[in-house]
Each structure stands twice: as structure tokens, then as C-alpha cells.
Amino acid sequence: LPAHARDTLTLGLIPAEDQRAIMTEAQPLIDRLEPALGMDVKAFVATDYNGVIEAMRAKKLDVAFFGPFSYVLAAQLAGAEAFAIAPLGKAGASYKSIIIARKDRGIRTVADLKGRTFAFVDPSSTSGHLFPKAGLLKAGFDPDTHFGRVIFSGGHDASAIAVQHGKVDAAAIADGLLDVAIERGAVKKDEVTVVWTSEAIPGAPFAMRRDLPPELKKRIAAAFATLKDVPWGKQVMPRFEPVTDNAYDVVRDTARLLNLDLKKMK
């Protein structure tokens, strides 16, 4: 049976951080969403970003909280439709990608990254792969050949910790998630430095399956619109603003710049 026939909404979450942490962070949203919807909400965290896209494509998810790039992929591959965004933290409805390094590694500029070990987050991560890769290329640095070694850590928190513990020389992560790692004591603020910062990136959207019944889609959008001041980890989602697919065209343009064929990103 489709999820809506069971009076249960399935909500997918990308594993931007440790899976347990994501589930804990999402619980207050689920607790508020259930009475607003008049439905049970069941959360699902995949082991990687593409797992959430695949689950939506298989119609196992009704709604998902994507990153901007994983949303663009899901829109093309899984019929996802962005409908809401929560302004988080200082930047509001946008955020930035940063490249961080340990201060004692002598990395001050992008050029200093040559020959170094580097961590991206996930191939489908916006601030942990797509935007920093494009930014490096614009700065004349080829991430495919200029690094000594590249790993995908699986999470922004894992990348920050890898830099802190000297497992890699530098890493690309979301600016807000560096703040979270510092607050949790996983990273010492005075031991890391920011080497590069991206332009503003449109924030992470909540998206629903385009082929859901129209009444259910209206019900979902209306429920999110009523939510205020929802805790998310140490931050608060003050409200949910409507967003449309074209807000993510800048992400599509960046993918094109890297010659990433979205059809092959599976």
C-alpha cells in the first residue's frame, strides 16, 4: 500500500552527520509534524546520500530533507519537488561551504593544498563536494590531480574530526556544521583555520514526491507552514518558508561547470 493509505508519512533524512545524531535532531520535528498532519511520521536515514534518493525513487518515502545537490539529483531521478525551507542559524535560508585545515599544517591558501590529503563528505554533498570542487577549479587547482590523496568521509562531522586528529590535512564542510563540531567539543576552534569560503548556497529543502495525491501534497505543505521554532540539534528552525525548484538552478549550473552528468550520478 502507498504510505498515505496507512495514515503514516515516511520522512527521509540524508546522513549529513552520524545517523544516530540525525535521528535525534529530527525527533522534535517529527513530534510537531504528527499532530499538524494528523498522521504518524516514520523517519528513515540512509547510509549515504544516494540511499535517500533511491528510497524516494522506489516510492518508499513521501517527503525527504535533502541537501541542495542531492535534491537536484532527486528532482531528476526520483520525481522530488521542493516545497519548504527552514532558515537555520545566522545565514538564514542560505549557507556556505568552507575548506578547513589544522593550523599546524602550514596551509593558508588553496595553492598550499597541493600534494596534501583531503576529505570530501559524499559525492552527492553540496557543501562537502560540489561547491568546493567547483571553487578549487575556479582557483586553478585541479582536485582530481593536485591532491596527494582524497577520501570521502561520509559525514561533515567525520570530516571535521579527521582534520582535528590529523587523519587528513584539510576538508570541505558546511560552515554551520563546523560550528556544531566546535560546540560538541569534537574540534578545537583555535587549532583549525578556514582556507576558503564559497559564495552563498541556497539552503537544504524539504521535498515531496511529485506523484503523491494532490490532497496529501496540500496537507503536507500546510502542516509544515504551521510549524514554528522547531529545535534541530543545537539550532532552531524558526519557521518553514515556501521554496520552488528554480531556487536550485545555481546548483544545477555548478554541476554543469564540473561536467557532472546528473543522469550518471546514481
Which positions does each model-derived feature cover?
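Short helices/loops that flank or line small-molecule/ion binding pockets
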Residues: 50-64, 77-78, 111, 155-176
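Ligand-binding cleft/hinge of the Venus flytrap
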Residues: 29-38, 128-151, 179-187, 257-261
